[in-house]
From Swiss-Prot:
<dbReference type="InterPro" id="IPR024550">
    <property type="entry name" value="TFIIEa/SarR/Rpc3_HTH_dom"/>
</dbReference>
<dbReference type="InterPro" id="IPR036390">
    <property type="entry name" value="WH_DNA-bd_sf"/>
</dbReference>
<keyword id="KW-0805">Transcription regulation</keyword>
<dbReference type="GO" id="GO:0006355">
    <property type="term" value="P:regulation of DNA-templated transcription"/>
</dbReference>
<comment type="subunit">
    <text>Monomer. Interaction with RNA polymerase subunits RpoF and RpoE is necessary for Tfe stimulatory transcription activity. Able to interact with Tbp and RNA polymerase in the absence of DNA promoter. Interacts both with the preinitiation and elongation complexes.</text>
</comment>
<keyword id="KW-0804">Transcription</keyword>
<comment type="similarity">
    <text>Belongs to the TFE family.</text>
</comment>
<dbReference type="Pfam" id="PF02002">
    <property type="entry name" value="TFIIE_alpha"/>
</dbReference>
<dbReference type="GO" id="GO:0003677">
    <property type="term" value="F:DNA binding"/>
</dbReference>
<keyword id="KW-0238">DNA-binding</keyword>
<dbReference type="GO" id="GO:0006367">
    <property type="term" value="P:transcription initiation at RNA polymerase II promoter"/>
</dbReference>
<protein>
    <recommendedName>
        <fullName>Transcription factor E</fullName>
    </recommendedName>
</protein>
<dbReference type="InterPro" id="IPR002853">
    <property type="entry name" value="TFIIE_asu"/>
</dbReference>
<dbReference type="InterPro" id="IPR016481">
    <property type="entry name" value="TF_E_archaea"/>
</dbReference>
<dbReference type="InterPro" id="IPR017919">
    <property type="entry name" value="TFIIE/TFIIEa_HTH"/>
</dbReference>
<feature type="domain" description="HTH TFE/IIEalpha-type">
    <location>
        <begin position="7"/>
        <end position="91"/>
    </location>
</feature>
<comment type="function">
    <text>Transcription factor that plays a role in the activation of archaeal genes transcribed by RNA polymerase. Facilitates transcription initiation by enhancing TATA-box recognition by TATA-box-binding protein (Tbp), and transcription factor B (Tfb) and RNA polymerase recruitment. Not absolutely required for transcription in vitro, but particularly important in cases where Tbp or Tfb function is not optimal. It dynamically alters the nucleic acid-binding properties of RNA polymerases by stabilizing the initiation complex and destabilizing elongation complexes.</text>
</comment>
Amino acid sequence: MPTSKQIINKKQDEVSDIYGKEMIRVIRSLLKHKIIDTESLSKKTGYSINTVRRALYTLQKMGIVRYINKEDKTLWQLLETDYEKILDTLLEPYKKEEKAETGELLFICPKCGRKYTLDEAEMYEFRCPEDGTLLVANQ
């Protein structure tokens, strides 16, 4: 059974493949600072301002960050502080697309709302690894 760290690493690799490796570094910097301006984030990540903005706009569309205008400065505020949930949010549109293509059955934890593939559900013996609740099939 894969460890939580292995699962996160796999999700992180998938996010990097889809959005680029800069997305991971931007997210990690946001997790450290919670509220930060674009220029500072650019310096902290080592990426150009345009690259950072592209990542931020993607995160904004997904509801992970929001911008705040304060005294002629745009600040970005992280709305979700759980790294794995951020990765899940970024991967969700692709997982849904993949599910539609393959007809794969998904399982959901009715308590926390996390989604699992059949393989993951089997791996966790159809119990949510976060809270132990029995997973239900999503149709």
